[in-house]
Each structure stands twice: as C-alpha cells, then as structure tokens.
Amino acid sequence: MDHRLLEIVACPVCHGKLYYNKEQQELICKPDGLAYPVQDGIPVLLEVEARALTLEESHP
C-alpha cells in the first residue's frame, strides 16, 4: 500500500488515524478497535467490511 495514501486516509467512524498492518493487509483504528481490509493495495474503508480487533490486538 502506498504510504502517501496512508497519510491522508482516516477512519470512517471516528475520523482518527489508521495504522497499516502489512502482515494482515489491514488498516487498524485503535480507538474503535476495527481493522479495515486492504485488497489489491486498495483500502476498503466501509464499516460493514471491518472486523473487530481481538482483545490481544487491541491491547498488545
């Protein structure tokens, strides 16, 4: 995923900063506990497509 894009995208729920998890190919919103998928380098920033983070993922 293009890191320039990461600088301008925001969580669609809280409008907060997203963190890229390269291993899982996801954008993470820590405050909301959501992970948005990145498919073919394109973030899918739809709340219905996001998965809830596990407790371990939320508080490492």
UniProtKB/Swiss-Prot annotation:
Name by which UniProt lists this protein: UPF0434 protein ETA_21370
Family: Belongs to the UPF0434 family.
Top-level taxonomic group: Bacteria
Species annotation: Erwinia tasmaniensis (strain DSM 17950 / CFBP 7177 / CIP 109463 / NCPPB 4357 / Et1/99)
GO (cellular component) term, any one: cytosol
Signal peptide: none
Pfam families for this protein: Trm112p
